[in-house]
């Protein structure tokens, strides 16, 4: 019995990956697949074991981490470039996932390469 991901859920994942830097809301995501917000929320959580918001944060943080490692952009520039509207939220999520603030993370990378 091969478990397949419903097309609508894969479309949502792809949409988030391609538009992570935009303002993503359940409302605008639900319009992409022509389903209700509550329906896509339930289905996404059932299929992937995480909420749509958690997945958006995951995608954004991966991009932020890459920018911290591979660019000289300021933390604020990176924060807004990956779609966060609030610096505090960016710091909070980043630290929760990587155990360090973005500044500390960048410093630790630079120390490894010195």
Over which residues does each language-model region extend?
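Hydrophobic, helix-rich cores of sensory/ligand-binding and other regulatory modules
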Residues: 1-2
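Flexible loop/N-cap segments at domain edges
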Residues: 5-8
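Residues within the alpha-helical elements of helix-turn-helix
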Residues: 32, 81-82, 97
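Short hydrophobic/aromatic patch on the recognition helix
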Residues: 39-40, 44, 89-90, 94
């Amino acid at each position: 019995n091969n478990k397949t991901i419903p097309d609508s859920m894969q479309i949502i994942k792809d949409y988030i990956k391609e538009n992570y830097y935009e303002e993503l809301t359940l409302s605008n995501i639900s319009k992409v697949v022509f389903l209700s917000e509550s329906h896509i929320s339930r289905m996404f959580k059932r299929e992937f074991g995480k909420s749509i918001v958690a997945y958006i944060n995951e995608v954004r943080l991966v991009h932020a981490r890459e920018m911290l490692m591979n660019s000289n952009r300021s933390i604020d520039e990176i924060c807004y470039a990956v779609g966060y509207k609030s610096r505090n939220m960016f710091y909070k999520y980043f630290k929760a996932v990587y155990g360090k603030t973005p500044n500390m993370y960048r410093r630790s990378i630079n120390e490894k390469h010195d």
